[in-house]
Amino acid sequence: VFKERTVGKTPVGTPTGTWVQWQPSGDFFTHTEVEIAKIKDLFKTITALCPGLTIVLSDNGTITTYYSEHGLNDLVDEAVKNKEVIANRFNMNFAEGKNKLDMVITYTSNYSLNLIPYVNTGLTEKGPHITQIKTILTREFNKFFREKKWLKEKDENLTGDDIQEGMYIVFNITAPNIAYDAQVKSTVTKIDMTPF
């Protein structure tokens, strides 16, 4: 462990970053074997959620570099690689203050909705953010369809089921003051979606 110290400005073109070495200790863990496949999947996901970030994994002399040029689109590519894609992708990036939403949507010939929700780069399973994203999408699709006159004044609005059939959505919300139900952070209990 080192004391904090000032190192000055890094010359332009000099690589920067953080180096972490980790080996599980039997003093603290009952299972000390590293599941490298899970770590590789995690690094692939993190670099897609943080485009421009490079992670270099050194595993017993084998070096693997993770970098995502296309961000969430790389996660969507992985999710739909064995599916029949029937629509162009819609990419959305929104930022206001400390709140940010990145989302990619596409459609496949499947009948169900496939939603992959991240909050502050952590995969989540449940929470009000999922319901609110579905509500926002339904509202915005109906608004768009009415502007294009694809829905006439007498027509009823499309339902969430109409819009979400075959939809693949990957999104990451970055926001402060999020509450979770447990340390695992799979269920969000409080999130302010007002900016979105």
Report the location of each language-model feature.
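Short acidic (Asp/Glu) and glycine-rich catalytic loops that position anionic groups and cofactors
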Residues: 17-25, 50-58, 84-86, 110-120, ...
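GHKL-type ATPase core
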Residues: 1-79
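GHKL/Bergerat-fold ATPase module
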Residues: 98-196
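Structural beta-strand/beta-sheet cores of well-ordered domains, especially the beta-sheet scaffolds
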Residues: 16-20, 45, 51-55, 88-92, ...
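Intrinsically disordered, low-complexity regions
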Residues: 25, 69-72, 83, 87-89, ...
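Duplex nucleic acid-engaging cores and interfaces of nucleic-acid transaction enzymes
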Residues: 36, 46-47, 83, 130-136
